[in-house]
Amino acid sequence: MNKKTVRDIDVKGKRVFCRVDFNVPMQNGVVTDDTRIRAALPTIQYLMEQGAKVILASHLGRPKGKVVEEMRLNAVAERLSELLGKRVVKTDEAYGDTVKAAIAEMNEGDVLLLENVRFYPGEEKNDPELAKAFAELADVYVNDAFGAAHRAHASTEGIAHHLPAVAGFLMEKEIEVLGKALSNPDRPFTAIIGGAKVKDKIGVIENLLDKVDNLIIGGGLAYTFVKALGHEIGKSLLEEDKIDLAKSFMEKAKEKGVNFYMPVDAVVADDFSNDANKKVVNIDEIPSDWEGLDIGPKTRELYRDVILKSKLVIWNGPMGVFEMDAFAEGTKAVAQALADAKDTYTVIGGGDSAAAVEKFGLANKMDHISTGGGASLEFMEGKQLPGVVALNDK
């Protein structure tokens, strides 16, 4: 990675504004999944050990520029205190005189968590005044929030213009793993693209067709490709306006010598519910009033074989409606194949795929699980991420 990291600067005695991604699920004022908090610990602990005064900033949810009581970060501060074994001071604002006073009280190795940065309308607008106000709190800026790196916000991009700006360890790992996959992959390189909508994955498919050996398609978006081949798909998800695009993707794959894998059978149901009647049919035999909600057993075997023969696999998007147990088998089979693939480097592209490997208890068998759904998607589209671009070059 050609960006400076926390290793490249001296932080002893300095106030370090560290943007993290603590956008964690909460219920009744308690953090229900602390994965993202844990992911930031190596950077936080390193800064503490180096004698920095660590000022943490994060968003939580979508308060839309105003204070929403249940989106305060108090519960996050409590959980972080437990994980660090040290009291974390939490302020009720994210900048201003009371925050400056709290920072003035800090000793080397202390940790302070600012209030939810999205309580201020200027955050998502990347307001230069707010960016300056954040910068006034610190001597150094560290961005460890890969999950927000695709956003040009005041705390992810604007602030970096006012302070020495470097990447944290999580940001560094994300960029290195995804960067190597896209620029210098081990082969055979397979991408598995699922999810509901073709339109959400157009950029990714376009970019990956130039890089992969195998492209595997699943999830709701597969039915637009099935339709493009001239098959009837019943009531399955269809994007009429993307049929021609699906055709062109398949043609491009052929031109480039990319193996393009699509479902050969499907689990169909007579209703979108866990209790619906369901059956397995060949992909060209979907009944007119049924809908495909998962890949079938023949497809699972086919995809498993491709995965086991690959040296690198990136997975983004589920194979079916895995939130319903009746239609989770396809997604589970892919997760299991990745777990069983011993000589394969497995990269899970955040979002639903990350949730799926967690759900099936296979997360610890994956080589890299991205912490950013949207950010990893844009990175895989070949886009520059504003939060990364703004950091100092080596």
Curated annotation (Swiss-Prot):
Positions carrying Phosphoserine are S183
Please list the residues that carry the modification Phosphothreonine: T299
The pathway entry for this protein reads as:
Carbohydrate degradation; glycolysis; pyruvate from D-glyceraldehyde 3-phosphate: step 2/5
Where does this protein reside within or beyond the cell? Cytoplasm
MF terms in GO: ADP binding; ATP binding; phosphoglycerate kinase activity
**EC main group:** transferase
Q: Which cysteines are joined by disulfide bonds?
A: none
Binding positions for substrate?
Answer: D21, F22, N23, R36, H59, L60, G61, R62, R118, R151
What EC number(s) does this enzyme carry?
Answer: 2.7.2.3
Catalytic activity, per the record?
A: (2R)-3-phosphoglycerate + ATP = (2R)-3-phospho-glyceroyl phosphate + ADP
* CDD domains given in the database record: Phosphoglycerate_kinase
Q: Which residues form the signal peptide?
A: none
Q: Which PANTHER family match?
A: PHOSPHOGLYCERATE KINASE (PTHR11406), PHOSPHOGLYCERATE KINASE 1, CHLOROPLASTIC-RELATED (PTHR11406:SF23)
Q: Which named protein is this?
A: Phosphoglycerate kinase
From which source organism is this entry? Answer: Anoxybacillus flavithermus (strain DSM 21510 / WK1)
